[in-house]
Every structure is written in structure tokens, then in C-alpha cells.
Curated annotation (Swiss-Prot):
Binds 1 lipoyl cofactor covalently. This is Glycine cleavage system H protein 1. One of its GO terms (cellular component) is cytosol. It comes from Aquifex aeolicus (strain VF5). The glycine cleavage system is composed of four proteins: P, T, L and H. The lineage of its organism: Bacteria, Pseudomonadati, Aquificota, Aquificia, Aquificales.
Length: 143
């Protein structure tokens, strides 16, 4: 399931996101499993409303996890066309099933940015090294 996506991985920012092409310039955006494990337990998520225009790296959502509140930046410039009401009601879905619990869908406004994303194969070593370095417990993640 995680291999059919592209990724934005910036370990120094503890940023691990997935992006899935839904066709017609629409992209689903979610939290990769390592970030879902780091953000356990996720208490709340506030997602920008449908119609919001965002530039690359602007806050797509605000997440509250443990004792932290952090922004979840957008990996692509675009317009929010859908938000996942289920994860707003039950944020812990992201912790347990990060690849089926998308956060928002964007209509991309700069398709060149997609070229900056990486395949699952390209991120494996970086993610494994980070898990070892930070001693990340990914056991909460079911998928």
C-alpha cells in the first residue's frame, strides 16, 4: 500500500509525508507511518477548509500530539478540494492506519513540485537510519 505513493521526507524537520496521485491533478496527502508513530497519540487535527489556496510548505493542518502542537505543511502548492472528516472526528486513525487515513486532497497548482517528491524505494534507507538513530517505536501502526 505504501509503495504506490510519493514521499516528502525531511528527517531534520521530523517531516514524513505521503502524496498519492488521484488523477486530474488531484493529490491525496497524508502522514507516513514513521510520523504517525512519532505523533502517537494524536489528539486533534485541524485541517484548512475546502477552497483554501496554499503555497508549498504552508500549514495544511495543525496537529496536537502528546504535549506538542505542530503544523503539518503542504507538500504541494494547491487548493484544498476535500478534507477527511473521519480523521478530524477520530485523529488516532492516522496513528493506526496512516496510509488509508488521508488528511486532505489538493488540486495541484504547480505540477513541477511533484518532481521533488521521492518514491518509496528512494526513501527506505533514510527512514531506516532515522528509526535506528531516534529509536522510533512503530508498533502502534497497523498498516
Amino acid at each position: 500500500m505504501w509503495t504506490d505513493r510519493l514521499y516528502r521526507v525531511e528527517p531534520y524537520r521530523m517531516l514524513f509525508q505521503w502524496v498519492k496521485d488521484e488523477g486530474n491533478g488531484i493529490y491525496s496527502v497524508g502522514m507516513a507511518s514513521i510520523l504517525a508513530a512519532l505523533a502517537y497519540p494524536l489528539y486533534s487535527i485541524k485541517i484548512k477548509p475546502v477552497g483554501t489556496k496554499l503555497e508549498y510548505d504552508e500549514a495544511l493542518a495543525i496537529i496536537e500530539a502528546g504535549k506538542r502542537v505542530a503544523t503539518f505543511p503542504t507538500p504541494l502548492s494547491g487548493i484544498v478540494v476535500d478534507v477527511n472528516e473521519e480523521v478530524i472526528k477520530n485523529p488516532e486513525l492516522i496513528n493506526k492506519k496512516p496510509y488509508s487515513s488521508w488528511i486532505a486532497k489538493l488540486k495541484a497548482t504547480n505540477l513541477e513540485e511533484v518532481k521533488n517528491l521521492q518514491s518509496a524505494k528512494e526513501i527506505v534507507k533514510t527512514v531506516k537510519d532515522f528509526i535506528i538513530l531516534e529509536d522510533v517505536d512503530c508498533s502502534i501502526v497497523e498498516e
